[in-house]
Amino acid sequence: GRIVKQRAEDGLLEDTFVFYFGDHGGVMPRSKGYAYESGLHVPLAVRIPKNFRHLVDHKRGDRTDGFVSFIDFGPTVLNLAGIKPHKELDGVAFLGQGVSAADLAKRDEVFGHADRFDEKFDMVRTFRKGKWKYIRNYQGYYADGLQNNYRYRQLAYDNWRDLYRADRLNPVQRQFFERRPVEQLFDLEADPHEVNNLAGDPDQAKRLADLRGRLRSKMKSINDLSFYPENRMVTDALGDGVAFGRKNAQQVSRLSDLA
């Protein structure tokens, strides 16, 4: 609020785009650091300044169901400034010239990931298309409730684990402390909390294979480096991870297929 007030006092508010978004939680289990929707899906509001409304194909108060990722912010700001985003830049503009409200509403795919969080390492990748979400747990032998000092300072985590150890949880509640399946598939409309895994449902076999392929293609396209151990990353990729990924693209692809 202070920044917006200052922009108004300086006479610059109607020349300023304001992007207002939430964090990924932190005190509730399955929020910050997790690849569930409770950890990935955050609110976003954009204030369009009067002097630049001609650049945006939205009316005041409009809402959209189109998917936006944080990597889209860079290309969006460049596009609003009249600068064509470089083709190798991650993300896609969601406002500005060439981006209609109808086009944005059609965007129904998004990639998600989780890796290291403090002393906890857990490689997870996700691909969502519309209401369907695919999760690949590369280290499914780890439970979601694996010890993490930051998290277990929060009462909800600590109390939940105490109830698990006392055998006072139902099967759904126990999932958080037990090993996860390698693959998970969720219908987010019917199951917004992602507890009913449909990956083993024969009726969903075709959809499972499709989303699995989409995720693998995405990981290869960005040269996902998490297949390498961290000590290798520190010695060989810390200076320029992008260059390291390009140089080792074929190996990344083979590791992805192997995993």
Each model region followed by its residue ranges:
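Long, internal low-complexity/basic segments
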Residues: H41, D167-V182, A190, L198-A259
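Polar, surface-exposed loop/tail segments
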Residues: E14-T16, G61-K129, D203-G213
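Conserved beta-strand positions that form and line the central face of beta-propeller blades
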Residues: V27, L44, A93, V110, ...
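Short, solvent-exposed loop/turn and secondary-structure capping segments
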Residues: V4, P29-Y34, V56-D57, N79, ...
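Histidine-centered active-site microenvironments of extracellular/periplasmic hydrolases
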Residues: Q6-S69, D90
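C-terminal, low-complexity/hydrophilic appendages and adjacent surface loops
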Residues: E37, F117-G200, K206-R207, T235-L238
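A generic secondary-structure signal for well-formed alpha-helical elements
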Residues: V4-R7, G11, T16, P49-F52, ...
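Beta-strand elements within well-structured catalytic alpha/beta cores of enzymes
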Residues: G1-I3, R7, F17-G22, P43-V46, ...
